Amino acid sequence: MGAGEERPEALGFNPQKEIVYNLLLPYAHRLDRESNELLAQIKGSLGRAVRLRELWPGVLFWTRKLTTYIRLYGRKFSKEDHVLFVKLLYELVTIPKLEISMMQGFARLLISLLKKKELLSREDLQLPWRPLYEMLERILYSKTEHLGLNWFPNSVEGVLKTLVKACRPYFPDDATAEMLQEWLPLMCPFDVTMQKAISYLELFLPTSLPPDLHCKGFRLWFDEFLTLWVSVQNLPQWEGHLVNLFARLANDNIGYIDWDPYVPKIFTRILRSLNLPVGSNQVLVPRQLANAYDIGHAVIWITALMGGPSKTVQKHLTGLFNSITSFYHPSNNGRWLTKLMKLLQRLPCCIIRRLHRERYKKPSWLTPVPESHRLTDQDVTDFVESIMQPVLLAMFSKTGSLEAAQALQNLALMRPELVIPPVLEKTYPALETLTEPHQLTATLSCVIGVARSLVSGGRWFPEGPTHMLPLLMRALPGVDPNDFSKCMITFQFIATFSTLVPLVDCSSLLQERNDLSEVERELCSATAEFEDFVLQFMDRCFALIESSALEQTREETETEKMTHLESLVELGLSSTFSTILTQCSKEIFKVALEKVFNFAVSNIFETRVSGRMVADLCRAAVKCCPVESLKLFLPHCCNVISHLTINDDVMNDEELDKELLWKLQLLSEITRVDGEKLLPYKEQLVQILHRTLHFTCKQGYTLSCNLLHHLLRSSTLIYPTEYCSVPGGFDKPLSDYFPIKDWGKPGDLWNLNIKWHVPSAEEMDFAYYLLDTFLRPELQKLDLYSSGELEMSRDEVQQCLAIVHNCLTGSGNLLPPLHGERVTHLVTSMVSLNETKLFTGIDHDHSRENYRELISKTLRKLLHYILDHSEDDTKSLFLIIKIISDLLQFQGSHKHEFDSRWKSFTLVKKSMENRLHGKKRHIRALLIDRVMLQHELRTLTVEGCEYKKVHQDMLRDLLRLSTSSYGQVRNKAQQAFFTALGTYNFCCRDLIPLVLEFLRPERQDVTQQQFKGALYCLLGNHGGVCLANLHDWECIVQTWPAMISSGLSKAMSLEKPSIVRLFDDLAEKIHRQYETIGLDFSVPEKCIEIAILLQHAASTSSQLPHPEELALAIKRQGEKNVEAVQNYERLVNTLLDCVTQRNLPWKFEHIGIGFLSLLLRDDYVLPVRAIRYLVQCLNHDALIVRKMAISTVAGILKQLKRTHVKETICPYKISGCPKPESKLVGDRPDNQWLLYDSSNLPNTKEAWESCCFVEKTHWGYSSWPQNMLVYAPADQQPKVGRSREEMSEAEQIIYDHFTDEKFVDQLIKFLSLEDRKGKDKFNPRRFCLFKGLFRNYDDAFLPIIKPHLERLVADSHESTQRCAAEIVAGLIRGSKHWTFEKVENLWNFLCELLRTALSNITVETYSDWGTCIATSCESRDPRKLHWLFELLLESPVSGEGGSFVDACRLYVLQGGLAQQEWRVPELLHRLLMCLEPKLTQVYKNVRERIGSVLTYIFMIDVSLPNTAPTKSPHISDFTGRILGKLKPLMDADEEIQNHVMEENGVGEQDERTQAIKLMKTILKWIMASAGRSFCTGVTEQMQLLPLLFKIAPVENDTNYDELKRDAKTCLSLMSQGLLLPVQVPLVLDVLRQTARSSSWHARYTVLTYIQTMVFYNLFIFIHNEESVQGVRWLILQLMEDEQLEVREMAATTLSGLLQCNFLTMDAAMQAHFEALCKTRLPKKRKRESGMVGDTIPSGDLVKRHAGVLGLSACILSSPYDVPTWMPQLLMDLSVHLNDPQPIEMTVKKTLSNFRRTHHDNWQEHKQQFTDDQLIVLTDLLVSPCYYA
C-alpha cells in the first residue's frame, strides 16, 4: 500500500482495511479525527446501551451507526475492536427470544463485519456453531409457523444462511466431529430428514481448516460422503447439496485431496445435469429437471480440480466442450441454453479468480495452494484453447452475446494472442455488412470486453494495438440515426477505446527517434489518422443531430419532450464526445473546438431535442479546456442576447425569438464548468441574468433560471476538473513524453493527482452576491403576496417559485441545514441518540444570512395562503412541494442521481476491470469517478437525523398537502412525505395520530379526498416506511383499530372502487410485511460481559454507567416487557371492540379478523375473549371468515397443548445387542425392535404400556443420536379424560362449543359444502383443527362426532367424503397419547368406518383418502397403528367391486406404507405375496397402481455404502421369479403382438398370453421406479432388455397399443440411466447379443439406445478403452446390416459419436470405409436379365452402401466447420453420385445437408478447399441431378 506505512501514527492504531478513496478527497486531512471521534462514540454508546439492557432504541440505533461507519470508512478500526464488535454482535444475534426484525438487522451487520475473512484469522477469533444451528432450527424448521403462531419475513432464510457462511471459518477445531454426531443420525435416505441433514452439513461443515487439522476436518466425512454420492444414481434432491459441499471443499483445499479416481464420474454427472436432448425421441425423467446441479458450484469444482501433476481434468474438460460445442451454435435453442451460457461465462471467471489467488493475492492466514498444484502457463493455454470454440459460437447466440463477451474479457486477460485474433476475424466482416445488424452489435460488444487487453498489447500480443485505429475508423458508420441499438453500441465502442488511448499525433517522432520497435513505428505512423477520426466522428454526430431535430421527427401536435430513446442517444452522444475531447492533444482539440463553435453558431436549433444535443457537445468542449473555449463562446452568446433584448418590449412577449432562446440555452450549458474560470466574465453574466430572468415567456425564463442554477453550482460545489487517462494531460513536448507508452495504462491509485475544484473565497462571494441580487427580491415579493399586500398573477407566482427553487438547488451545499430545538418525548432512552455531522468540504459561514431558513419561513406562509385562497393553483403547489423536499434534504446532490451514477460506475468497472491482477488497477477516469462518488456518499449520509421543530412543521405541511383536494398534488406530496419519514428519527410516532385523525368515525367534516389521502399516507410507497405496519406495539395499537373503525366514517364509501382497492392493498401489505413483534426484550449476561470490554476499549470513559443506573436499567427492562404484554392485550381487545361494532360493513369485519389472526404467538396464549369470538367464527356466514377461523383455532389449540414428558433411553439395552464396531447403516440387530412384527403386537394393555414407541421414522436407520428421547410412560404424562372443572378458562370455551350438538351440527354442515367444484383437495388446515381437538381433549367429543362420521362416510358425494377423511386423519393423529382402552375403542369404531369408506370410494375421492391415510401414518410408530395396517392388508386386490376399487385400495395402502419406509418389512413381504399372483391383471388402472406400489415395496432395497442387506423384499429375487414366467416370450421369434382381449375369457389362457399381461405390469413398474428410487437395479433390468428391444416399435406412432408405447418409454428411461463403471460391460454384452437378433426392429432400437446411453455416461465409457472399442465394433457391424433402415441409423449414430468426440475419425476407420466403397457391383446388364431376385440387394451392394454411409457420417459429424480431412472425403463421395439406389439417395442427402449447414460461413470454409476441389464441389451442389 502506498500510504500504508504512516497510518498507525496518524490514527493511533493499525486499521484493518479502510476505504482508500477517502485519502484522495480534498479534505482528507480532516477525516482521521472525524472517524476516530465517531468510532469512540460508537464503542462507548453501543457498550453502554447493551449494559443498560436497552435493545430498543439504544442498541439498534448504535448498530445502525456502526453500519454507516463501515459504509463511510470501511473497516477502519483496530483488530482488537474488530474482534470485540464481532463477538458482541454474535451474542446479540443469538439471543433466543430476540424479535425477528432486530435479529435480521444484527445479522446483516455481523455479515459485513465478517465479510473479508482474511482480516481475522482463526487465532484471533473463534465462534461456536451450536447457537447458530439452534437459531436455524427454530426459524427455518419452525414447528409453529405453519399454524400461524410465528410470522417470519421471506428474506430471513437468505440472511441466516449467509450468516452461517460468514461465521463458518471460525468454528472451533472439534466442530466437525460434533456436527457429524448431531446430523448423521438423520441420514435416512427415504425420509425428508435426509435433505435436512445434508443441507445442514453443506451449510455448516468447515472446509478451510489448516492442513495439520485435516484429520479433525474433512477426513472425518470425505470418504463416506463421496461413496454415497457415487452410488446414488437417480439424482435425489439432496445430491445437489452434496455437490455444493464437494465444490467448496475442493476449492478450499486445492492440492490436498486426490480427486483423480473420481474425475470421469464428476464430469459424467455434470454433463447429465445440463439436461441436453439426445437422439430423436427422448422422454426426460421428470424429477431430473428440478434437481440438477447448480452450475455455479459445478464450475467451482472443476476449476479447483485443474492443475497439478496429472492432466486428467483438462482432458475431460476438453472432452466436455467437444461433446457440447454443437449445442452452442446459434441455430440451436432450448431451455437448456441458459445453463450452457452460464457455464461459459462462469468458467473463465473462476479460473481468473484462481490464478489471482495463486499469483497476485496478498498472502493471508488461509491455506495457500501448494507449488506443485498451481496452474502453470501451459495449463492456462490448454484451458483457453479448449473453451474458445464454444465461446466464438456463443457470440451470436439467440439469448444475446453478454455471456460470451464476459467470457472473452476474462480469457483475453490470460491469453490475448489466442483470444483476440479470432474475435477480430469475426469483427471486421461484421463491420462491413449492412444486412446483419445483429452481427455487428454482437461482435462490437465482445470487442469492448477485450478492449483493454487489445490496447495494452503486452509481451503475449504486441501487435494488438495496431488494430485499434482501423477498428475505430470502420465503426464510424455505426453512428446511424435509423438504427438505435447499433448507434448505442457504437458510441460505447468508441468511448471505450478513446478512454484507453491518448489521441495524440506522434507521427513526427518517426523522423526524430530511431530507437523504436517495429510495432511502435507502425503505431506512430497510424496516429496521424487521429485528427481525421475525430473530425469524421463530429460530422457523423452533426448529421445525427440534424436528423433528430423536432421538426424532423414529430408532427406539431405531439409532445415536445424528448422521448426515452432520444434521451439515451443524447447521453451516449455527449459522453462519447466528451471522452474523445478529454483524450485529445491540444492541436486536435483546437480543430475540434473550431468545428463545434461554427456548427453551433451558424445554425439556430429548437431547444427541445437538437438544441439540447448541440449544447451538450459545446459543454463537453468547454469543460475540457475552459479558458480557450469560454473566450470563444461566452462573449459571442452574451453579445447576441444583449443585442436581441435591447428593446424592453421583448420582456412581455409570449413567444420569444428562436435565436434568442437558442443562445440562452447554449449559454446556460457552457457555464457548467470550473467556477473560477467564469469569474472574469461575472459582470457580463449578471447583466444577462438581469435582462432575461423576468421574461414573461415561460421557455425563456426557464432557460435563464438554468443559467443562474449552473452559475451557482459551478462556484459552490466540490468536483474534479479533469478525467484525463494520464495525470497532467498530454500537452507535453513529444521529445520528453512518448504517448504510446500510455496506451491502455491503468491509473495509479497513489499518484492520481486529481485536480479538484474547491470553492475559493472569491467564488463564495460571487455566489452570495447572486443570491442577494436575485433570490431576496423574489422572497420579498412572495412575502407581500402572502400577506395580501401585493397582487400577483398565478404565472408570476410560478415564476418567483421557479427562481427560488433554482437558487436553492444551485447553492444547496453552501446553505447550512435548518436549525431549531429537538422534538422530545417521542421515545425514552438512557443512551444519547445524537446525529453524526460529517464534514463535506465547506465550513458554513454563519455570519451571512442562511437563506434556507428564510425560504422556509416565506414558503410556509405562502403555502397556507394558497391553500386557503386558491387551492386550484396546482402548478404552484407542485413547485412548493419540490422546494420543501429540497429544503429538508438537499445538500448538493440528489439520492436518485447518485444511485444511477453508482450503478453506471459499477457497470463500466465490470466491463473494463482486470480481475486477474486485482489491486484496483482501473483506468484513471474510473478511479476519479469513484473518489467523487465517495464524496457524494458523504453528502448524502443523513442517517439518524434529529427531528426538530422546523422539520415537524414542514412534515405537517406535507401531510396537509397529502390530504388536499387534487389527486396529483396529493401524490407528489405523499412521495416527499415518505422520503422525509425515513430520514428523521422517531418522527412516525409524532405523525401517526395526525394521520389517524382523518379516519375517526366521529368526525363529520372529513372529505373523501382527505380520507383517501390519509389511507395512502398509511400505505406508504414501495420499499419505504409503511405507517400502518411499524414493528412496534405502540404504533400498531393505534393504527390497526383505526383502520377498522374507519368503516363507520362518513367519508368511507364502498361504492368507490378506488377506496375499496386501497383497503385491499392495506390489508394485503400488512399481511405480507407483518413479522411477529417481540414481547421479551431481555439481554443475557454473555452480551453484557463483552459490552464492558467494548466500553473500556473506547477512549472516552465518561459514559460508564453508575450502579444506580444499572439497577434502574434492570427495573426498566422488566417494565418494558410488562408494557409490551399490556399493549398486546390492549390491541387484541380493541380489535375485538371494533369488529363487533354495530353497522360495521362486512369488509371491515373480515379485515379485522385477518388482523386478529396475525396476532397469534407461540409464547403467549391469546386472551380468552378473542378465543371465544374466533371459535364462534367457525360458524360464521361468510366462507372467507370460516377459513380464517379454522386456521386460527388450530393455532389456539396448539397454544393450549400441554407438554408431554420425554425420557432418554439406551437403544442397545432394549435390543440386547452391543454397539456395532464398524459403521453399519440399515437393518441391524440393534434396531430390530423398531420393526413391525405381527407375532408380537401391542394388543393388550400390558403389552401396550411396556412397548417403547419411537414415533419418528428415521431414528435408528443410520445411527442412534447421542441422546435418544422417547415419551415417558402414561402415568408421568398430563392427565387424560379430564372433567370440565379441571380445564383452564380458555380450554373450557372450546370444550363448551364442541360439546354443543347444534354447534357441531352446523360446523360439519359447513365443512361438507364444496368450495370450488373439482378443485378442492384434502385440506391440511382442517386436519390440524381436528388433530388439535382430539389431542387436547382426547375422546371428549367423540360421542358427538361419531354419528356425523357414520353419516358422512355412507354418502358418496365428493365434499362429504373429503370432510370425513379430514376428521378421520385428525382423529388418528390426535390419539397419539390416548390410553390403550380409548385407542382400542377408537379403532373398533374406525375399522368399520374405513371399510365402508373404501367400498364407497369414487374417482373424485380416492386421492383424499390416500392423503388421509398417508397423513395418519406420518411420524407414527407402525406398531401403534397395527389395526389400520391389518385392515388395509386384508385383501388388497380382491376384484370385488370392480377394478377401480382395487386400484383405490392399493393407492390408499401405498400412502400408508410409504410413510413407514423401512420399518415394516413384514408388511411389504405380505403385500408382495398378495400381489405376485395378480400381476397379470387385465385392467390398465390396476396395472399402473401395482407398478407404483412395487416401486415402494422395493424402494428400501438400496445399495448405498455401509448398508446392511435389507429385511424388506429384494429386487433380484423378484426379477428371477418374473423371468421364469416371461420365458415363453423370450424364446419366441416372431414379433410380439398385443392380442389379449381386455375382458377375461373363459378358461385358462395359454402361457404366452399370461406372459404378455405380466409384461405390461412389469413395464409399468420400471417406468414408475425411474424417477423415484435411489439406485437403479441395473443388473436385474439388463435381463429384461432383450425383450424390450423386441417389443419396442421403430416409428413414432401414437396409436400403437399400450404395450409397445410403454416398452419404448422404458427403453428411453433406461438408456438415460447413470451407469456405474462395473455395469458397463454387462450392458454391452446384452447389446451385442441383441444385435444378432433376427428382428431388424430390435437391431434398430439397439442403435437409438446406444446414442443416449453413451452421451449420458460419456466419460465413464471413455475412461474404459475396452467399452469404447466394443461400441465401435457394434456400430461398424450394424452399418453392414442387410436392412436399409438399420444401416442408416447406424450411420446417424456414428456421426453423433464422432461429433461428441467419443470416437475419432482415425486413419484406420477412413481406410475401412474407403475399402468398402470400392466393392465392385455386378454389371448392370446382368441385373436386367429378368432375374426374380433383383429386388433383394446383393451383399456387394450392402457393403458398398456401408462404405458410402461411413463417409457420409464423417462429413455430417462436423456441421459447423471444415476439418482437414473433409475435402478429400467429399471428393470420394462425389464418385458415387450415379450408383444404384439406395446409394445415390444417401449421397444426395449428404450433399444437401452439407450445403445447408455450411452456407452461413461459406466464405471462410471455402479457404479449406483447393481450386480443383471447389470446381467439382460447385458442380455437385448445383448439378442438374440436384434438381432431378
Curated annotation (Swiss-Prot):
One of its GO terms (molecular function) is peptidase activator activity. Its main location: cytoplasm. GO terms for cellular component: cytosol; nuclear speck; nucleus; spermatoproteasome complex. Keywords: Cytoplasm, DNA damage, DNA repair, Nucleus, Proteasome, Repeat. HEAT repeats lie at residues 462-506, 985-1024, 1164-1202, 1339-1377, 1621-1659, 1665-1703. It is found in: Cytoplasm, Cytosol; Nucleus; Nucleus speckle. GO terms for biological process: DNA damage response; DNA repair; proteasomal ubiquitin-independent protein catabolic process; sperm DNA condensation. Residues 1635-1723 are annotated as: Bromodomain-like (BRDL). Pfam families: HEAT_PSME4 (PF23096), HEAT_PSME4_mid (PF16507), PSME4_C (PF11919). Homodimer. Interacts with the 20S and 26S proteasomes. PANTHER family: PROTEASOME ACTIVATOR COMPLEX SUBUNIT 4 (PTHR32170:SF3). The bromodomain-like (BRDL) region specifically recognizes and binds acetylated histones. Associated component of the proteasome that specifically recognizes acetylated histones and promotes ATP- and ubiquitin-independent degradation of core histones during DNA damage response. Recognizes and binds acetylated histones via its bromodomain-like (BRDL) region and activates the proteasome by opening the gated channel for substrate entry. Binds to the core proteasome via its C-terminus, which occupies the same binding sites as the proteasomal ATPases, opening the closed structure of the proteasome via an active gating mechanism. Belongs to the BLM10 family. This is Proteasome activator complex subunit 4. It comes from Xenopus laevis.
